[in-house]
Design a protein with these regions (language model features):
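Bilobed "Venus flytrap"/periplasmic-binding protein-like clamshell domains
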Residues: 36-45, 55-72, 107, 125-179, ...
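Periplasmic-binding protein-like
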Residues: 41, 123-134, 206-245, 264-289, ...
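Extended ligand-binding regions for polar small-molecule ligands
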Residues: 61-69, 141, 146-147, 152-154, ...
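Short beta-strand-to-loop elements that line the ligand-binding cleft
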Residues: 74-86, 170-178, 218
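A ligand-binding cleft/hinge motif common to bilobed small-molecule-binding domains
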Residues: 89, 104-114, 159-166, 185-188, ...
């Protein structure tokens, strides 16, 4: 009996130790010699691919700065690996340790905070509507009877439903597996509109075959804090990420990175999104925080 209890105690200790290590990113990457960044294929200027395994963008570059400091904390150079994630799998892959830091376009909300942790907000998004330029659609009320695209696993799905109930507009939702797929639904005529984060819409329009064929219209549907995501219960890594962002904000480098990706010409086509930082984004930089979207709604 004593041997059995001793074995159970050892097993419990090993399990708790393994759990602690799984949530200790600094220890994890120090032991493995590598860190995995979760990136997106088409999340506007926040995170996108150039092909051949190359990923760039505002959040990708901020994550690279965080990883620079992670290497200092680990005391070694790390092999940086990239894993393409989607709106559906980004949280599970972060939770299970496949991804160490997710650098895409994830909205910080209360439900997600129960599963993962977020760094200080680095971008405050405005949810908008993209349509074909010749559609005649200028606001959400004109979507009655239309097919409206959004991306599976994003908060825009809930937002669409709330607007449908609030305004009495009866539209059919069609879902893309990722943002590029959702834009393709609009581009091909299978959807009459695409509702998503404004910079994602602008990025997909800018990189389309005929940017002049599309436009962003209507009122701002919602304001959402977008942040870099990682595992919960890892205070040391959260502090490292937050301290990195705080230093970038204090030095003015964060504003320069924003200008680089949202105002200036970006690869691969040297297109310009021309999206100057909103007052909400500047406010997030001035008063760094990790508040969820619900806190913004209460204002």
């Amino acid at each position: 009996m004593k041997k059995h209890l001793f074995a159970l105690a050892i097993a419990s200790l090993l399990a708790s130790t393994a759990f602690a290590q799984a949530n200790d990113t600094i220890a994890k990457v120090k032991a493995s010699g590598s860190v995995t960044m979760g990136v997106r294929d088409s999340s506007g200027a926040l995170s996108y691919t150039l092909g051949d395994g190359k990923y760039v963008g505002y959040h990708v570059e901020i994550c690279q700065r965080i990883i620079d400091n992670l290497e200092k904390a680990a005391g070694k150079k790390l092999d940086v690996k990239y894993t393409s994630v989607t709106s559906q799998n980004r949280i599970p892959l972060t939770e299970n340790g496949t991804v160490d830091i997710e650098c895409g376009s994830t909205t910080n909300n209360e439900a997600r905070q129960k599963q993962v942790a977020f760094a200080f907000t680095t971008f405050v998004e405005e949810v908008r509507i993209a349509v074909r330029a010749n559609s005649g659609i200028t606001n959400i009320a004109q979507l009655n009877g239309k097919n409206v695209a959004t991306t599976t696993g994003t908060t825009s799905v809930q937002l669409l439903r709330k607007n449908e109930r609030a305004t009495g507009v009866d539209f059919k939702e069609v879902f893309g597996k990722d943002h590029a797929d959702s834009f393709l639904l609009l581009e091909s005529g299978r959807a009459d509109a695409f509702v998503m984060d404004g910079q994602i819409l602008a990025g997909n329009i800018a990189n389309s075959k005929a940017p002049g064929d599309f436009k962003i219209v209507g009122e701002v549907l919602n304001v959402e804090p977008i942040a870099i995501m990682f595992r919960k219960d890892d205070p040391a890594f959260k502090k490292l990420a937050d301290d990195t962002i705080a230093a970038l904000a204090k030095s003015g480098e964060l504003a320069k990175l924003y200008d680089k990706w949202f105002v200036q010409a970006i690869p691969p086509k040297n297109t310009k999104l021309g999206l100057t930082a909103s007052d909400a984004t500047k406010g997030a930089w001035a008063n760094l925080n990790d508040k969820p979207v619900e806190a913004y709604a209460k204002k």
